[in-house]
Amino acid sequence: MEWWTAFQAFILGVVEGLTEFLPISSTGHQIIVADLIGFGGERAKAFNIIIQLAAILAVVWEFRGKIFQVVRDLPSQRQAQRFTANLLIAFFPAVVLGVLFADLIHEWLFNPITVALALVVGGVVMLWAERRKHVIHAEHVDDMTWKDALKIGCAQCLAMVPGTSRSGATIIGGLLFGLSRKAATEFSFFLAMPTMVGAAVYSGYKYRDLFRPEDLPVFAVGFVTSFVFAMVAVRALLKFIGNHSYAAFAWYRIAFGLLILATWQFHLIDWSTAGEM
């Protein structure tokens, strides 16, 4: 493995790890950075699956205590049963719409204008959600009802539109539906586990012919890097929201959306590769 290839894998692993669970759209960042460092082609599809899987495994590791507790208590404890049911309920809408419309959305909406508009609109909605008067009825994830879970699951479906951000959609949805920042953020992380693992398994099977033994070192660099930086991002976000709102992320989304429009308008980024990400 050449040093430049290793460097590319490292950089993209950092980008994936830092942006996957922040409400700022990891897809848009990956497209721009991949173009800047010249990383593309069929290997990029397989590589993206690997680093996304690493990011979600970082969340699994970070919340391993809660996961173990739920699994242990599932046969007998009502709270664990309700939490699991809420995850399944929230996961279901994305499964249905993903099966029905994923390819169609990827074909028609994966373009710089859609990504940029989704970022800007999402940023504006996030600002509004933060500034409106909060009536919190679920301080912790264990306080959520099945109706909360279903509404957040429907909100997650908006993330099928490129640039929306899965974490952004679920966190904003949680805030609008009466969850505290902590509960909305943590449930977003938990919901990411089945959602992203399912997406990775589906994509891995779809592109199974692209996984080659000679690419293993590149995948390993990206995997480890994404795992480490995803863990850093998750811990930092949980600490950040304890004393701050999501306004900073909202303004960043708006600025980033305008940047994407500029890169497209002035042909600074090869957005023809967007559909490959």
From Swiss-Prot:
Naming one, the record's GO cellular component terms include:
plasma membrane
Per its UniProt entry, what is the enzyme's top EC class, as one word? hydrolase
**UniProt-listed Enzyme Commission number(s):** 3.6.1.27
Transmembrane intervals: 47-67, 85-105, 108-128, 183-203, 218-238, 249-269
Q: Where does this chain mainly localize?
A: membrane
One MF annotation (Gene Ontology) recorded for this entry: undecaprenyl-diphosphatase activity
Recorded catalytic reaction(s): these are: di-trans,octa-cis-undecaprenyl diphosphate + H2O = di-trans,octa-cis-undecaprenyl phosphate + phosphate + H(+)
Q: Which terms does the UniProt entry file under GO BP?
A: cell wall organization; peptidoglycan biosynthetic process; regulation of cell shape; response to antibiotic
Q: Which residues form a coiled coil?
A: none
InterPro entries registered for this protein in UniProt: UppP
Q: Pfam families this protein is in? A: BacA (PF02673)
Q: How does it sit in the membrane?
A: Multi-pass membrane protein
- Keywords noted in UniProt: Antibiotic resistance, Cell inner membrane, Cell membrane, Cell shape, Cell wall biogenesis/degradation, Hydrolase, Membrane, Peptidoglycan synthesis, Transmembrane, Transmembrane helix
State the disulfide connectivity: none
Which compartments is it annotated to reside in?
A: Cell inner membrane
Q: What else is known?
A: Bacitracin is thought to be involved in the inhibition of peptidoglycan synthesis by sequestering undecaprenyl diphosphate, thereby reducing the pool of lipid carrier available.
Q: What does this gene product do?
A: Catalyzes the dephosphorylation of undecaprenyl diphosphate (UPP). Confers resistance to bacitracin.
For this chain, the family text in UniProt reads:
Belongs to the UppP family.
Q: Which PANTHER family match?
A: UNDECAPRENYL-DIPHOSPHATASE
| Protein name listed in UniProt | Undecaprenyl-diphosphatase
Q: Which organism is it from?
A: Pseudomonas aeruginosa (strain UCBPP-PA14)
Q: Which gene encodes it?
A: uppP
